[in-house]
């Protein structure tokens, strides 16, 4: 859906949250089912003029259907309605130690909420569903995992921490976020 039209629907939903289910149906009707193949910079790069908060997790590809089913079952029980669709994409396994696709074919599930609408309960619910399927959070999007919870999700996490300590022993390249996700590991 075109940015301006979707932005208008989101602002209306934020102003009158009880309209969100009807606005979502309108948005869904305006979207067309489509399938296409092209270079990733042409497929995944789109202008985003509607502001939102986002969380994204990578799950084993074989867990995708179950995770989406659980999310679809649980979201209607939230006190606050969700304004954005869920995004899904897939990728092949790789061998990059801290990649969300390390060692497994992966499906990515991204959730969003329009800026100014409550999102914490939705994101907490999402994280609990992702935890059930060994989901790995996108390093640059909202999540609450710390080193203690991230370590078991990445088979080479300890190796990475060792290399990090050797190459940056004084944490000159650190910040509060990196301390949270790397320094609390035991």
Regions found by a protein language model. Name each.
Residues 1-186:
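Noncatalytic alpha-helical scaffold of FAD-dependent oxidoreductases
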């Amino acid at each position: 859906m075109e940015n301006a039209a979707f932005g208008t629907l989101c602002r209306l939903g934020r102003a009158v949250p009880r309209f969100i289910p009807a606005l979502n149906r309108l948005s869904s009707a305006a979207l067309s089912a489509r399938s296409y193949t092209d270079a990733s910079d042409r497929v995944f790069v789109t202008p985003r003029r509607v502001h939102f908060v986002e969380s994204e997790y990578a799950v084993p590809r074989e867990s995708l259907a179950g995770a989406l089913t659980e999310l679809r079952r649980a979201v209607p029980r939230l006190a606050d309605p969700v304004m954005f669709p869920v995004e899904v994409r897939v990728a092949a396994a790789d061998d990059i130690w801290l990649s969300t696709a390390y060692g497994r074919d992966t499906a990515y599930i991204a959730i969003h909420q329009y800026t100014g609408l409550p999102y914490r309960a939705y994101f907490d619910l999402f994280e609990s569903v992702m935890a059930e399927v060994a989901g790995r959070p996108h390093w640059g999007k909202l999540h609450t995992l710390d080193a203690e919870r991230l370590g078991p999700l990445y088979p080479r996490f300890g190796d990475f921490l060792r290399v990090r300590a050797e190459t940056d022993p004084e944490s000159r390249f650190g910040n509060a976020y990196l301390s949270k996700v790397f320094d609390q590991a035991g």
